[in-house]
Amino acid sequence: MEKPVTDRPSEAEVEAAVRTLLRWTGDNPDREGLIDTPKRVAKAFREMFGGYDMCPAEELGRTFEEVAGYDDLVIVKDIHFHSHCEHHMVPIIGKAHVGYLPDGKVVGLSKIARVVDIFAHRLQTQEALTAQIAGVIQDVLNPRGVAVMIEAEHMCMAMRGIRKQGSTTLTSTFTGVFKDTPEEQVRFVTMVRGGGA
């Protein structure tokens, strides 16, 4: 999964667009409290959408083959993230649970969390985020299978429209043996939910 290629506007163009949005809300972008808002928003957006400048596959490039014979399920759970809905550009706040069955090589645990962060720092749908995480791990590590579950609250449902605060959306995707073997799916979900293997 490569870095997306875009024709990125200049910082001055971004700041001008924010001034326009401030005027559109009915406020005055020249008042004291808003004078620096366009610059602050541009800086915040660069941070919140920094995933476009990173390649998640590169994070998985360094693997370890000497793991004392371990070849069973590896799960990194409760990876908290913030993303933004591609439809309304409002926050998605949630946590990801990522598991894989190694096939001779493992990756540092922090790299799994880093992959989640890179994709989360792009405009997203939860469904796409779930599939992207699983896809890059499957493509780069080539494990026997990958399982990803995401639980998230969408501010586009909480702050606008239907206004249902606290509702959570669950998505999951499975590759390899997880896709082919329902018992492996159950084992993953049971371990994520706090049960034994």
UniProtKB/Swiss-Prot annotation:
Keywords: GTP-binding, Hydrolase, Metal-binding, Nucleotide-binding, One-carbon metabolism, Zinc
Catalytic reaction(s) noted: GTP + H2O = 7,8-dihydroneopterin 3'-triphosphate + formate + H(+)
Enzyme class: hydrolase
GO biological process, alphabetically ordered: one-carbon metabolic process; tetrahydrobiopterin biosynthetic process; tetrahydrofolate biosynthetic process
Known pathway: Cofactor biosynthesis; 7,8-dihydroneopterin triphosphate biosynthesis; 7,8-dihydroneopterin triphosphate from GTP: step 1/1
GO cellular component, one term: cytoplasm
GO molecular function list: GTP binding; GTP cyclohydrolase I activity; zinc ion binding
Residues bound to Zn(2+): C85, H88, C156
Stored PROSITE patterns: GTP_CYCLOHYDROL_1_1, GTP_CYCLOHYDROL_1_2
EC number(s) recorded for this UniProt protein: 3.5.4.16
Family: Belongs to the GTP cyclohydrolase I family.
Quaternary context: Toroid-shaped homodecamer, composed of two pentamers of five dimers.
Protein name: GTP cyclohydrolase 1
Lineage of the species this protein comes from: Bacteria, Pseudomonadati, Pseudomonadota, Alphaproteobacteria, Hyphomicrobiales
